Amino acid sequence: MKQYDTFIIGHLCIDEILNSAGEGEFSIGGAVVYSSYAALAGGNHVGILIKSAPREKMIPYILPVHTEDIYWLRSDSETTSIRNQFLDDKHERRITTALAQGSTITVAELPEGISAKIYQLAGLMKGDYEDDIIKVLAQRGKVALDMQGYLRVPDPSTKEMVYHDWDRKQEYFPHITYLKTDAAEAEILTGTSDRREAARLMVEW
């Protein structure tokens, strides 16, 4: 049994970054990528489960995670890709568009023979994970979750990212130990802009 402090699960993302002048570049992104750097910097033994199309299969191996600690999944669709179009030079306002979304990470795709203190779901948009993956992982260790992976949804016509409430939140919140949400996401979840009240409601769930 291979043991990790943190096991991070998510999609590789090919980011397109456009500045306010419309000039652009592509970069490797995704919460699973950046979270692995942060977890390693904290001295943790880190494993990652990362999903992409076959043509991007080798990209995760440039990460500082040891090769034997990278578990790659084949996406049945494309590699997730997101465009961030910044509207000002300070990068404070932007339009985010889903160019492609990888296939859902399912319970059946979780690797065998590993255990972790924390399983981090580093999602990018709704549909990244099969919902029941939360309950399954909570039986194995503590679950950490970024709410953008459950609230952020591509608009069917424009593909711009919009936010919708999670209708199964009260069913799954008791299985989450570490929850990351910003003020806007917390208001969508709870219906209140009062941060303390929003935090209280989420803890009660």
Segments predicted by a language model, with ranges:
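Active-site metal-binding loops of divalent metal-dependent hydrolases
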Residues: G10-L12, A31
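Histidine-anchored nucleotide/phosphate-binding helix
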Residues: A31-A41
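Conserved N-terminal subdomain of the carbohydrate kinase-like
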Residues: K2-D5, I14-F26, A41-A122, G127, ...
